[in-house]
Swiss-Prot record:
InterPro entries: Calcineurin-like_PHP_ApaH, Metallo-depent_PP-like, Metallophosphoesterase_sf
EC number: 3.1.-.-
Protein name: Uncharacterized metallophosphoesterase Cj0846
Positions that bind a divalent metal cation 1: D158, H160, D190, H314
Residues making up the signal peptide according to the UniProt record: none
Species assigned in the record: Campylobacter jejuni subsp. jejuni serotype O:2 (strain ATCC 700819 / NCTC 11168)
GO MF entries: metal ion binding; UDP-2,3-diacylglucosamine hydrolase activity
Length: 374
C-alpha cells in the first residue's frame, strides 16, 4: 500500500511538472514554434517511461538494459522544471522593466532561449553522469584520543549493486579504492539492491579490495528489502568480508562493531542490538561503530564509541531533498560531533537509488585518516 501511495504521488508530481514545462516553456520558445506536436509526443513518451520505471522497477522481469534506460527519463523533467522556473522569472523581470524596442526584445529573447536550451542539455547530462560515474575520493581527518597508531580507512556506503550499478561499476570502485592503499575498508550498508541471485556471478570481486586488516561490512535497509537471509548467505559464501551484525571485533589496538539496521525493527530480523555489542566493547580502547542510518545516533546512546560511520542519506541525492532528509534522519552529510568523545561521519554514498540523478549531492569514496591525540 505504501509503495502504491508513493508511486501515485511521484507520478502526480512528475505529470504536473511535465505539463508545466510544456505549457510554460516549450510552447513559449520561439525556436520551437514549428515543432510543438513533436514535443507533445516527446513529453507523453517521457511520462509513460517514468510511469513504467516507477511501477516495474522492483520487477525481476525488467531487464538491466531497460532499467538503466528508463532510470534516465526522470532527469529531463527534473532539470527542465527548474529551467522553466528560471524562464518565468526572467519574463517577470522583463515585464517589470517595461516596454522596449521590439527588435531588441526579439534578439534578447532568442539569446536567452538558445542559452536556456544549451544549459538544459548540459544539466540533464551532468545530473545523470553525476549518478553513474565512479565516485571522487574525499579525505577527512579525524582525531581519536585513545587510538595508539594512525589508521587509514576507506569508507563506502550505498553502493546499491543491482540493475543500474553492477559489475563494471564495482570493478572501477575497487580499482580506485586500492589505489589509496588503505589499512581497512568498511562498507556501511546498502551494498545490495536486487535479488541476491543476480549478483552471484561477480559478488566475489568484493574480495579484490586490498587492505591490511580486511573489509568490514554492516547491513543497510535495502538488504532487508531483497531477503536479508539470502543476502547474508550470498556474502558469507562468496566473500571473505567480516560481516558485523550486532557484533564487535577486537583488532587489538581498536574495536570495530556493526549494528543491525533500523529496518530490522519492522521485520523482526537482525534489529539493532546495542547491548549485545557493548558486552564485548573495551571502552578504554579506540572504537568504531558501523550503523547504516545516522538517526540511530538520535535513538540510541552511542557515547561509548569514538567514531560512528553511517550512510543512507545519499547527501539528499537530488536538490532540494537534502532538507527532507535532515528532517527524517537528523543528519545529511559530513562530520558531526555527538558529544565530548563521539564523532559521526555521514557519507553521501558511492552509488544511488531510483532514477539516475544526483544534483548538488556528489557521490564519494571517503578516506578517513584517523589520528591518535599527540
Amino acid at each position: 500500500m505504501i509503495f502504491l501511495i508513493f508511486s501515485f504521488i511521484v507520478l502526480l508530481i512528475f505529470g504536473l511538472a511535465n505539463v508545466y514545462i510544456y505549457k510554460r516553456l516549450i510552447k513559449k520558445i520561439t525556436l520551437f514554434k514549428y515543432f510543438y506536436k513533436i514535443f507533445s509526443f516527446i513529453f507523453i513518451v517521457l511520462f509513460l517511461a517514468q510511469a513504467v520505471f516507477l511501477i516495474f522497477r522492483r520487477d525481476e522481469y525488467l531487464s538491466d538494459t531497460w532499467y538503466e534506460i528508463l532510470a534516465m527519463f526522470y532527469a529531463p523533467t527534473y532539470c527542465l522544471f527548474f529551467m522553466t522556473l528560471a524562464w518565468d522569472f526572467v519574463k517577470l523581470i522583463l515585464a517589470l522593466m517595461g516596454k522596449r524596442d521590439k527588435t531588441y526584445n526579439l534578439i534578447l529573447r532568442l539569446i536567452f532561449e538558445l542559452s536556456l536550451i544549451v544549459l538544459s542539455v548540459f544539466l540533464i547530462y551532468a545530473s545523470i553522469n553525476n549518478a553513474l560515474k565512479t565516485p571522487e575520493v574525499k579525505s577527512v581527518d579525524v582525531e581519536i584520543p585513545n587510538l595508539k597508531k594512525d589508521l587509514k580507512i576507506v569508507m563506502l556506503t550505498d553502493i546499491h549493486l543491482g540493475k543500474n550499478l553492477h559489475e563494471n561499476f564495482l570493478d572501477k570502485l575497487i580499482t580506485k579504492v586500492n589505489l589509496q592503499s588503505p589499512d581497512m575498508v568498511v562498507i556501511v550498508g546498502d551494498l545490495i539492491d536486487t535479488n541476491p541471485k543476480d549478483l552471484k556471478n561477480y559478488i566475489s570481486k568484493l574480495n579484490d579490495f586490498n587492505s591490511t586488516y580486511g573489509t568490514f561490512y554492516a547491513l543497510g535497509n535495502h538488504e532487508y528489502y531483497h531477503g536479508i537471509n539470502e543476502v547474508l548467505d550470498l556474502l558469507r559464501k562468496h566473500t571473505n568480508m567480516k560481516i558485523l551484525v550486532n557484533q564487535n571485533l577486537d583488532l587489538g589496538f581498536i574495536d570495530i562493531a556493526g549494528l543491525g539496521d533500523l529496518a530490522g525493527l519492522d521485520r523482526g530480523l537482525y534489529a539493532p542490538d546495542l547491548a549485545r555489542i557493548k558486552v564485548d566493547l573495551n571502552t578504554s580502547k579506540a572504537s568504531i561503530l558501523l550503523t547504516h542510518q545516522p538517526k540511530t545516533a538520535l535513538l540510541y546512546d552511542l557515547s561509548d564509541f569514538d567514531l560512528v560511520l553511517s550512510g543512507h542519506t545519499h547527501g539528499g541525492q537530488i536538490f532540494p531533498f537534502m532538507f527532507l532528509v535532515k528532517l527524517q534522519q537528523g543528519f545529511v552529510h559530513g562530520l558531526y560531533d555527538l558529544g565530548e568523545k563521539t564523532k559521526l561521519y555521514v557519507s553521501s554514498g558511492a552509488g544511488f537509488w531510483g532514477p539516475s540523478l544526483r544534483v548538488f549531492a556528489p557521490s564519494e569514496i571517503v578516506i578517513l585518516n584517523l589520528k591518535g591525540k599527540k
